[in-house]
Curated annotation (Swiss-Prot):
EC number assigned by the record: 2.4.1.-
Organism from which the protein derives: Arabidopsis thaliana (Mouse-ear cress)
Lineage: Eukaryota, Viridiplantae, Streptophyta, Embryophyta, Tracheophyta
A UniProt-annotated Pfam family: UDPGT
Superkingdom of the source species: Eukaryota
Molecular function GO labels: UDP-glycosyltransferase activity
Name of the molecule in the record: UDP-glycosyltransferase 76E4
Ligand binding (UDP-alpha-D-glucose): 274, 333-335, 350-358, 372-375
Amino acid sequence: MEKRVEKRRIVLVPVAAQGHVTPMMQLGKALQSKGFLITVAQRQFNQIGSSLQHFPGFDFVTIPESLPQSESKKLGPAEYLMNLNKTSEASFKECISQLSMQQGNDIACIIYDKLMYFCEAAAKEFKIPSVIFSTSSATIQVCYCVLSELSAEKFLIDMKDPEKQDKVLEGLHPLRYKDLPTSGFGPLEPLLEMCREVVNKRTASAVIINTASCLESLSLSWLQQELGIPVYPLGPLHITASSPGPSLLQEDMSCIEWLNKQKPRSVIYISLGTKAHMETKEMLEMAWGLLNSNQPFLWVIRPGSVAGFEWIELLPEEVIKMVTERGYIAKWAPQIEVLGHPAVGGFWSHCGWNSTLESIVEGVPMICRPLQGEQKLNAMYIESVWKIGIQLEGEVEREGVERAVKRLIIDEEGAAMRERALDLKEKLNASVRSGGSSYNALDELVKFLNTE
């Protein structure tokens, strides 16, 4: 009688946020398709927990809440993450202990989001291989390494020197010191300390990154040399895994019916992610700029994204009337389906990494309105490296909005960006096909996990 081969188990540990959960779950789907059992270890977070249940065949275990999420407002993002890591070690060890005792659970590996480095202690104690997963770009991972070696005092002094600001990091053209993502994490010193924790305290066996060689070959080569462990670029994971990933917000599918009535490449799609907030004036200027562009638009406005207002009631009635005649306003949209629709000609984005990849995969050029450090770096690559978008800088004014939309949708400049975006689309799709770089990287990762 043939001996039954037990499948090996992989434990995934995501950050409890849409931009981190989505690619982690896509990674899980890709590994599940290669024969691994998947367990997701998550903190107590009801909204995300209910969303993850849409993944049949995945097991879910809870890491007890060690630090209330409300503390992030008191501490700042970097300090909160460091405290979360300190307080989560013991509860995660207990979680892994229970999993290890279950019969038939041969844990091949713990794969954890780079910000959840508390997982290393449990991996080391139970002698389980661990792998880091970066949900952001390879270039951001490079920046973490660079920032981990800086002192806050010297960095602040250097940033007052224009010559130092514009200095290109060696071997990483066009990345400059002033492009390092230092905003959005609170005070500088806790951020640098967090980077040191993220980079220097790890004994992981490998790094997985949601990117592709055709997008970031220099950064990937730099990381491979600097880290001294295998680096696996598996992206874009939403096509590697053939899965859009979980949505934590209810999607308005009726917007697709509206898109079906629009002309090809005529619509500007606007979505600023799950966390962005706007001032009243900014929203009004956006509305007038979109109206004055005379282009149809699909505008995602999350409830509560404008302080003091539930949704769009802050707009004057005549503006709401014109907006709904010219465009479509949704509380949330099925983004991958929207970007792949032939009516969409451009994407106004906050330039989160998932949105950036999703736009490139569909060959859609972008208007970039980044809000914080990582997004600003992505926007720089979109505009200056890949040349598939334009940045909308400074205060949002209706004239600038109108001009940006026309440049992207109507002008020859936008047509050239679209051609470059379509070229990148083909390269990315080739990377996940048999023999492509991401396809091969996934096979190499599977071999690596089976030999660890």
